[in-house]
Amino acid sequence: MPKLKTKSGAKKRFKITATGKVKHAQRGKRHGMIKRTKKQIRQLRGTRVLFKTDGDNIKKYFLPNA
């Protein structure tokens, strides 16, 4: 049976850390920023780490060769 292909959309959205955790960009910064406070916008910067079970599912189904 051939190897599973990595989903290209997931490849762009998620990164695997050296310890095996899955990082992703914070959501909610594409549009509609006018109604958010400066504090809310500032807190949306950077990346977050997924919960272990969610990260395991991402690695299993979308990033099988990572």
Curated annotation (Swiss-Prot):
Q: Which Pfam families match?
A: Ribosomal_L35p (PF01632)
**InterPro entries, per database record:** Ribosomal_bL35 (IPR001706), Ribosomal_bL35-like (IPR021137), Ribosomal_bL35_CS (IPR018265), Ribosomal_bL35_sf (IPR037229)
Q: Which GO terms describe its cellular component?
A: cytosolic large ribosomal subunit
Which residues lie within the region annotated Disordered?
20-40
Show the GO MF annotations.
Answer: structural constituent of ribosome
Q: Name the keywords, alphabetized.
A: Ribonucleoprotein, Ribosomal protein
User: GO annotations under biological process?
Assistant: translation
Fetch the HAMAP family from UniProt: Ribosomal_bL35
Q: What protein family does this chain belong to?
A: Belongs to the bacterial ribosomal protein bL35 family.
Under NCBIfam families, the record lists: rpmI_bact
Q: Which PANTHER family match?
A: 54S RIBOSOMAL PROTEIN BL35M, LARGE RIBOSOMAL SUBUNIT PROTEIN BL35M
Question: By what name is this protein known?
Answer: Large ribosomal subunit protein bL35
At the highest ranks, the source species' classification is: Bacteria, Pseudomonadati, Pseudomonadota, Alphaproteobacteria, Hyphomicrobiales
